[in-house]
Curated annotation (Swiss-Prot):
It comes from Campylobacter jejuni (strain RM1221). This is Large ribosomal subunit protein uL22. GO terms for molecular function: rRNA binding; structural constituent of ribosome. One of its GO terms (cellular component) is cytosolic large ribosomal subunit. This protein binds specifically to 23S rRNA; its binding is stimulated by other ribosomal proteins, e.g. L4, L17, and L20. It is important during the early stages of 50S assembly. It makes multiple contacts with different domains of the 23S rRNA in the assembled 50S subunit and ribosome. One of its GO terms (biological process) is translation. The gene is rplV. Part of the 50S ribosomal subunit. Belongs to the universal ribosomal protein uL22 family. Residues 110-141 are annotated as: Disordered. Keywords: Ribonucleoprotein, Ribosomal protein, RNA-binding, rRNA-binding. Pfam families: Ribosomal_L22.
C-alpha cells in the first residue's frame, strides 16, 4: 500500500469530494482514464495524486486499486471586497488536502455458494367473518 498527499489545493473540499467518491474502489488505470474526461477542476488534482501514489509504491497502474481517496478541508484564505457606503464583505477562498491510498488488487477465487431450497407451505384461504351487529333502519317521520 502506498500513499500520496497533495496539500493546499485551491479548491473547495465539497466540490473535490464529489469527484473523490467516484474513483474510490476503482482500478487506478481506469480511474485516471475516467478523470481525464471529467470537466471539473478537481479531477486533474485527484488524477495527479493517484499517479503519484502509484509511483510512490513502485506499482503499475493496472495492478492496483484506489483503496481510499480522502479530501480534507485546509486553511481558508479570507479576502475583502469593497461594498456600498464604505463597508466591506468577506470573500472565503477555501483550500483542501487530497490523500490517496492505493493497494494491490486482491484476486479472489470464486466460491460456489450452495443455496438452500426454500420450503413453501400452502395456507388455507381466509374465511369471511360476519359481523354480529344488527343493521339499524332509520325511521322516516
Amino acid at each position: 500500500m502506498s500513499k500520496a498527499l497533495i496539500k493546499f489545493i485551491r479548491l473547495s473540499p465539497t466540490k473535490a469530494r464529489l469527484i473523490a467518491r467516484e474513483v474510490r474502489g476503482m482500478n487506478a488505470e481506469l480511474a485516471m482514464a475516467s478523470l481525464k474526461f471529467m470537466p471539473n477542476k478537481g479531477a486533474k488534482y485527484i488524477a495527479n495524486a493517484i499517479s503519484s501514489a502509484v509511483a510512490n509504491g513502485g506499482f503499475e497502474a493496472n495492478e492496483v486499486i484506489v483503496k481510499s481517496c480522502r479530501v480534507d478541508a485546509a486553511a481558508v484564505l479570507k479576502r475583502f471586497r469593497p461594498r456600498a457606503r464604505g463597508s466591506a464583505s468577506r470573500i472565503r477562498k477555501p483550500t483542501s488536502h487530497i490523500l490517496v491510498e492505493v493497494a494491490k488488487a486482491e484476486v479472489k477465487a470464486e466460491e460456489k455458494k450452495t443455496v438452500a431450497k426454500k420450503t413453501t407451505t400452502t395456507k388455507a384461504p381466509a374465511k369471511k367473518t360476519t359481523s354480529t351487529k344488527k343493521a339499524t333502519v332509520k325511521k322516516e317521520s
